[in-house]
From Swiss-Prot:
It catalyses: ATP + H2O + a folded polypeptide = ADP + phosphate + an unfolded polypeptide. Its EC number is 5.6.1.7. PANTHER family: 60 KDA HEAT SHOCK PROTEIN, MITOCHONDRIAL. It comes from Shewanella oneidensis (strain ATCC 700550 / JCM 31522 / CIP 106686 / LMG 19005 / NCIMB 14063 / MR-1). Together with its co-chaperonin GroES, plays an essential role in assisting protein folding. The GroEL-GroES system forms a nano-cage that allows encapsulation of the non-native substrate proteins and provides a physical environment optimized to promote and accelerate protein folding. Keywords: ATP-binding, Chaperone, Cytoplasm, Isomerase, Nucleotide-binding. This is Chaperonin GroEL.
Length: 545
């Protein structure tokens, strides 16, 4: 086992804080409408220009092991916020840096780290409850467009296109983002169906940059049983090899020899294939398989209706224009089923909804109906260059996550105002001692940090802006986009409640743990072995007699 270096107390905390600051300072320049871009070097291709906090955070690795630990913990804050709400990563990073900085000052002054953490936790619990009270429903298309605009760094065209997409496929509909061919953004609404089952083996992936499987004009085989013997699939695979088209297998499960053979055939390029489990369980699975069959114009191969997999032909398979499979979801776009049959199936499900007495069953039936009758909206991002395309696509994806979060939990005034208003209402949280009280104060000060950073990035004096906003009430705040004060909701500056809540919770959780650090352990850097010295020249050989 390699030797380790251990640092204690203040030495450890100073190193950790240095790492936190390096990462947070790189991320926080992107915050707000006047935030700057960060350029990321790539080992291949052109550099990536981004204003997305989590993209910047993920690129940072520091040479010093102890500083790197601090940076990695803040990176975790950004990643968690991104996973939970899809946005708010920069806000979370700024909050974490503020809590760690203030917390470590208090620890250096002799306060108890555990009590400080308890105080911070109490303040955050109260703040989250207060955020829910402050939250308003995000019901209309205008509010959705405003949320999308703010998340896409004040790009109104992105906010508008997302609002239109949600209007067309419904708030629960499936919206995907793709790279377009034009200079402008375009919206395509395609009939399609998505269900929550991903690929059965990562070896099916053919788009490594997105970690997904994409099949163009595939056949779709639907089987209501487990497939473990490859012999059952041979007739279909042989027929398929002649057509040169890909195949999507949707079955109860594909395992053992069958899965291994499919993977090998796929990797060798003999047959382009992907397999996923059928959605749902029991009777619901049978019904959902039938939905997919009607959508794609195929037949469900089930022994209970006298159909055997070995005797199946290409006529039994459904077809679709495109299938996209990720780790968690499968989307079938433009199935070639007959419209009359799809409409009949939708009206049949409507009838079942009316007759059902169970709320759970009704919800599941409505989901099925939306998938059959709704569709998939595809936002095609337009740009002049590949570098701009990547940057714009990341912003559209962020905006989409933010609007979904807004529909889910509502919206609060944006621009850091919500946290300022919440902080003013929770100053008297009940605590057990003075150190816990200081923990609450640390959390309250940190809640000002996002607004201060937005003002700093806009070239304003942060303290002046923060005081002006604190002296106001309700939705009164600072619009950094045009350097004015006013009602944030009227100016269309909204943040999803879920994004603000997640940012605060994850920042406090990880920053609180960092404050309580007393020792750090890391491997010693390996000393490079010296190069071998040059070998002396060989002496000449004596003349031979």
């Amino acid at each position: 086992m390699a030797a380790k270096e251990v640092v204690f107390g203040n030495d450890a905390r100073v190193k950790m804080l240095a790492g936190v600051n390096i990462l947070a300072n790189a991320v926080k320049v992107t915050l707000g409408p006047k935030g700057r871009n960060v350029v990321l070097d790539k080992s291949f291709g052109s550099p990536l220009i981004t204003k997305d906090g989590v993209s910047v955070a993920k690129e940072i690795e520091l040479e010093d092991k102890f500083e790197n630990m601090g940076a990695q913990m803040v990176k975790e804050v950004a990643s968690k916020a991104n996973d939970a709400a899809g946005d708010g990563t920069t806000t979370a990073t700024v909050l974490a840096q503020a809590i760690v900085t203030e917390g470590l000052k208090a620890v250096a002054a002799g306060m108890n780290p555990m009590d400080l953490k308890r105080g911070i936790d109490k303040a955050v619990i109260a703040a989250v409850a207060e955020l829910k009270n402050l939250s308003q429903d995000c019901a209309d298309s205008k509010a959705i467009a405003q949320v999308g605009t703010i998340s896409a760094n004040s790009d109104e065209s992105i906010g508008q296109i997302i609002a239109t997409a949600m209007e067309k496929v419904g708030k629960e509909g499936v919206i995907t983002v793709e790279e377009g061919q034009a200079l402008e953004n375009e919206l395509d609404v395609v009939e399609g169906m998505q269900f929550d089952r991903g690929y059965l083996s990562p070896y099916f992936i053919n788009k490594p940059e997105t970690g997904s499987v994409e099949l163009d004009h595939p056949f779709v085989l639907l089987v209501d049983k487990k497939i473990s013997n490859i012999r059952e699939l041979l007739p279909i695979l042989e027929g398929l090899a002649k057509t040169g088209k890909p195949l999507l297998i949707v079955a109860e499960d594909v395992e053992g020899e069958a899965l291994a053979t499919l993977v090998v055939n796929n990797m060798r390029g003999i047959v382009k294939v992907a397999a996923v489990k059928a959605p749902g369980f029991g009777d619901r699975r049978k019904a959902m398989l039938q939905d997919v069959a009607i959508l794609t114009g195929g037949t469900v191969i089930a022994e209970e209706i006298g159909l055997e997999l070995e005797k199946a032909t290409l006529e039994d398979l459904g077809t679709a224009k495109r299938v996209v499979i990720t780790k968690d979801n499968t989307t079938i776009i433009d199935g070639n089923g007959e419209q009359a049959q799809i409409e009949a199936r939708v009206s049949q499900i409507k009838q079942q909804i009316e007759e059902s007495t169970s709320d759970y069953d009704k919800e599941k039936l409505q989901e099925r109906m939306a998938k059959l009758a709704g569709g998939v909206a595809v936002i095609k991002v337009g740009a002049a260059t590949e570098v701009e395309m990547k940057e714009k696509k990341a912003r559209v994806e962020d905006a989409l996550h933010a609007t979904r979060a807004a529909v889910e939990e509502g919206v609060v005034p944006g621009g850091g105002v919500a946290l300022i208003r919440v902080a003013s209402k929770i100053a008297d949280v009940e605590v057990a001692n003075e150190d816990q009280k200081h923990g609450v104060v640390i959390a309250l000060r940190a809640m000002e940090a996002p607004l201060r950073q937005i003002a700093t990035n806009a070239g304003e004096e942060a303290s002046v802006v923060a005081n002006n906003v604190k002296n106001g009430s309700g939705n009164y705040g600072y619009n950094a986009g045009n350097d004015t004060y006013g009602d944030m909701l009227e100016m269309g500056i909204l943040d999803p409640t879920k994004v603000t809540r997640s940012a605060l919770q994850f920042a406090a959780s990880i920053a609180g743990l960092m404050i309580t650090t007393e020792a750090m352990v890391a491997e010693l850097p390996k000393a490079d072995a010296p190069d071998m010295g040059g070998m002396g020249g060989m002496g000449g050989m004596g003349g031979m007699m």
